[in-house]
Amino acid sequence: MKKIRILDCTLRDGGYVNNWKFGFENIKDTVKRLIQAGIDIIEVGYLSSKGDFSADESQYSSVDAIKRILPADRKNTLIAVMINCGDYDAELLPQYDGTGPDCIRVCFHKSQALQAVELCRKIKDKGYKVYFQPMVALSYSDAEYLGLIGMANKFRPDVFYIVDSHGSMKQKDVARFFYLIENNLDKEIAVGFHSHNNLYLSYSNAQYLAALHTDHNLIIDSSIMGMGRGAGNLNTELFVEYLNETADADYSTEPILCSIDNTIAPIYLTTSWGYSLSGYLSSKYRCHQNYARFLSNKNTLTYVGMNAIFSKIEPEKRDNYDREYIDKLYTAHMSAGGE
């Protein structure tokens, strides 16, 4: 029988809201509270050699920096960190010894698939659990996705992810990718699901996956109060309650509420996230969420006008944000008398 686990990504995906500046003590407190809640996996941020990060940020240039925010007793919780493919050299990773992160998620664009596989192999050779995370699942044809699954079956990551990068997936889309995985991925490899809430479907899509009969173990990503870029993510506090009621889970909600009081709610008061019409439009056209932010921040467009601009974004420009490109579309729209 499948096991369903929660991966909380507040400190990583939530960092898009506040530029990862949670504060050192708040980072430690968030990790502590999630461990107290019994959350299975905590993603503590990004590992990258592309910047010089302070102790107040949930971005780290070394494994030693991650160790400083971890408590001595993690109970049964695993600690994860994400690497964007190309941002960190696996040669810099120390051999896994159980005192730092347990799991490393490798996130990559379609063009980086072979590079990502090689990175995953090196990370796995150092003893870490590896999560294989191809972004923007909807950008893959069935044949392309089956090719990724075939790669995964050869190097055997611990988890293979379905990623709804733009919050565009409806249930039929989740089903499409899940059954490609179910029928072709090695049963020993778990299936992960990372979503964004642009269409208010993160919760229902997660429930759909949780209810499926499958031999694959599942990992569902969520964040406290749904904290994340744009529309945010699945709410940890909601999905915890759902699994407690439907899957005989035993998560504790009070520590999560403590984290909300201590850290997350104060951030929300100054920099909110959640559903927006601009986010809906970016999802409708399967575009990077930064396009929605750019157009919304102009404060000059009607939503009809914004829709018109989104409709002109070429397919090859949708997945990766191009500020110069969207600025040209915006200028052309306004010059033509748009509003």
Kindly give the residue locations of the regions a language model identified.
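Catalytic cores and adjacent flexible loops of soluble metabolic enzymes
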Residues: 1-339
